[in-house]
């Protein structure tokens, strides 16, 4: 996993409010980060944070009530040895959860070694879940793509095409028909799971749509709160192409896909020409995609019917010749 620039300070700043964190020791270790080799070999955020574990000392160590109780039962020599081994390998930081007070000797050792020590009243399980989700988000593969990203009938749809084809105008018409804007011009996509890519709008462009001749439109102000969305999962790409595009296939037999962060996203191509109602075509493409996701393929059904009709006709002709 890629965690460049992620430090104890940045994790604390991003999660202090949600987890009610207090920094009680090791302030000098604010720049401490994950071991580079350890982070590279981690397959998921579950490898980066967990309950106290001396076998995996390089991860974020969370100590709840059971761990503190266990620690307090140890004799002084065992405490010193085990914590010494843990601190020596420089975990990013330690978290004392469940509202427990940090043992004085552990707090002193963290201070001397510049190991950040946080406390929180939140349960240890909740802390681990929250930090795993946080680390998954900041380390996830991401890309910025050009287009208009919309919520159409509950489906995340990215409208793409070369400049001047009317992507923003089409987006504006779809918004006026009750659909929602996620982002215009630049869309930030993050792969958060094996089959889950989330799209968001960069903060600078939030709620804005640029239309030639009109300039920047604040969609939230013009159409209201329900006309914008914070994020959506991408499920469909609509590629606008010019009428004279020789590569356009009228009835594609095989589904078309666009690779986004290593995940194939279903794509349809729509020709742009005078008199064509693109908004209706996009809505129809979305409805058809919903049917495909449910296992209903209209083109395949038609081909099966055609094949059955041809076979029946061939049988009928053969029987006629026999007579």
Swiss-Prot record:
Residue ranges, annotated region (Important for the catalytic mechanism of dephosphorylation): 271-276
GO terms of biological process kind: regulation of carbohydrate metabolic process
Ligand binding (ATP): 161-168
Residues of the active site: 146, 167, 185, 250
Sequence positions that bind Mg(2+): 168, 210
Comment, domains: The Walker A ATP-binding motif also binds Pi and PPi.
Assembly behavior: Homohexamer.
Task performed by this protein: Catalyzes the ATP- as well as the pyrophosphate-dependent phosphorylation of a specific serine residue in HPr, a phosphocarrier protein of the phosphoenolpyruvate-dependent sugar phosphotransferase system (PTS). HprK/P also catalyzes the pyrophosphate-producing, inorganic phosphate-dependent dephosphorylation (phosphorolysis) of seryl-phosphorylated HPr (P-Ser-HPr).
Record's protein name: HPr kinase/phosphorylase
Organism name: Cupriavidus taiwanensis (strain DSM 17343 / BCRC 17206 / CCUG 44338 / CIP 107171 / LMG 19424 / R1)
């Amino acid at each position: 996993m890629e965690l460049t620039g992620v430090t104890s300070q940045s994790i604390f700043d991003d999660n202090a409010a949600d987890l009610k964190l207090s920094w009680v020791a090791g302030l000098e270790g604010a720049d401490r980060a994950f071991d580079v080799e350890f982070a590279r070999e981690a397959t998921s955020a579950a490898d980066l944070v967990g309950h106290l574990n001396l076998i995996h000392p390089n991860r974020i160590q969370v100590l709840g009530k059971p761990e503190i109780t266990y620690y307090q039962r140890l004799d002084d020599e065992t405490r010193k040895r085990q914590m010494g081994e843990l601190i020596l390998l420089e975990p990013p930081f330690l978290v004392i959860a469940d509202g427990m007070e940090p043992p004085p000797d552990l707090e002193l050792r963290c201070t001397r070694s510049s190991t950040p020590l946080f406390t929180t009243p939140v349960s240890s399980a909740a802390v681990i879940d929250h930090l795993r989700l946080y680390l998954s988000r900041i380390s996830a593969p991401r890309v910025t793509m050009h287009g208009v990203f919309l919520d159409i009938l509950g489906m995340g749809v990215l409208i793409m095409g070369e400049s001047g084809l009317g992507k923003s105008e089409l987006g504006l018409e779809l918004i006026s028909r009750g659909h929602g804007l996620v982002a215009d011009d630049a869309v930030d996509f993050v792969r958060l799971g094996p089959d889950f890519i989330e799209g968001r709008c960069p903060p600078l462009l939030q709620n804005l749509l640029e239309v030639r001749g009109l300039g920047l439109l604040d969609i939230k102000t013009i159409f209201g709160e329900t006309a914008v969305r914070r994020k959506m999962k991408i499920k469909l790409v609509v590629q606008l192409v010019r009428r004279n595009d020789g590569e356009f296939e009228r009835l594609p037999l095989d589904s078309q896909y666009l690779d986004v962060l290593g995940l194939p996203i279903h794509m349809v191509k729509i020709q742009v020409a005078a008199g064509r109602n693109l908004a209706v075509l996009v809505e129809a493409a979305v409805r058809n995609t919903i049917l495909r996701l449910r296992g209903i393929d209209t083109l395949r059904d038609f081909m099966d019917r055609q094949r059955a009709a041809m076979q029946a006709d061939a049988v009928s002709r053969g029987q006629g010749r026999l007579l």
